[in-house]
Amino acid sequence: MKVKICGITDMETAKRACEYGADALGFVFAESKRKITPGLAKEIIQELPANVLKIGVFVNESVEMIQKIADECGLTHVQLHGDEDNYQIRRLNIPSIKSLGVTSESDMKNAQEYETDYILFDSPKEKFHGGNGKTFSWELLAHMPKELREKTILAGGLNALNIEEAIRTVRPYMVDVSSGVETEGKKDVEKIKQFIIKTKECSK
């Protein structure tokens, strides 16, 4: 099971997450309490192992700006959390991830219409797109087609206490955590370590 730690804002957390076995790190360029500047993201990314995915998170940003930041920072993927459509997705010259809020089983059908490399299933959107720390009913995704499951990233309120049930129910390709590895709004490296250990253990 692959693990993505999202909302990275400092070098130390990024390096420790990689040491503990994170497969991907997320950098938020949209409005969020975890927003990072392209300059700082570039500094961090330059120090990371080549095999770790570096994913930029955007919300309704222009294709030109997404591409500019991706090239400048050395991103490997971009994650689209807004109302982006296939026309915009096709214009991107970088692998992409489309985020969808889950409210019913029909969201699986909607997801298959997007021409992206991965689909990230998250809790329904609130003030900020993602990172709200709230779960949704994983049972809604329990019967997805194999071809969709193989490109599914599961997010939304995950933590070390509920990750086993989430993985058992959805069986995604990757899990994505942000607020579930924080203490008082800041990334907690011990929680990151425990989340990664638990995820890898229960997906063997």
From Swiss-Prot:
Gene Ontology molecular function, alphabetical: phosphoribosylanthranilate isomerase activity
One Pfam assignment: PRAI
Pathway linked to the protein: Amino-acid biosynthesis; L-tryptophan biosynthesis; L-tryptophan from chorismate: step 3/5
Keywords: Amino-acid biosynthesis, Aromatic amino acid biosynthesis, Isomerase, Tryptophan biosynthesis
Keyword Amino-acid biosynthesis among record annotations: yes
Top-rank lineage group of the source organism: Bacteria
Catalysis performed (reactions): N-(5-phospho-beta-D-ribosyl)anthranilate = 1-(2-carboxyphenylamino)-1-deoxy-D-ribulose 5-phosphate
InterPro entries assigned to the protein according to its UniProt record, in alphabetical order: Aldolase_TIM, PRAI_dom, RibuloseP-bd_barrel, TrpF_fam
Enzyme Commission number: 5.3.1.24
Biological processes annotated in GO: L-tryptophan biosynthetic process
SUPFAM superfamilies (alphabetical): Ribulose-phoshate binding barrel
PANTHER family named in the record: N-(5'-PHOSPHORIBOSYL)ANTHRANILATE ISOMERASE
NCBIfam families in the cross-refs: PRK01222.1-3
HAMAP family: PRAI
Entry's family note: Belongs to the TrpF family.
Protein name per UniProt: N-(5'-phosphoribosyl)anthranilate isomerase
Species name: Bacillus cereus (strain ATCC 10987 / NRS 248)
Gene name of the encoded protein: trpF
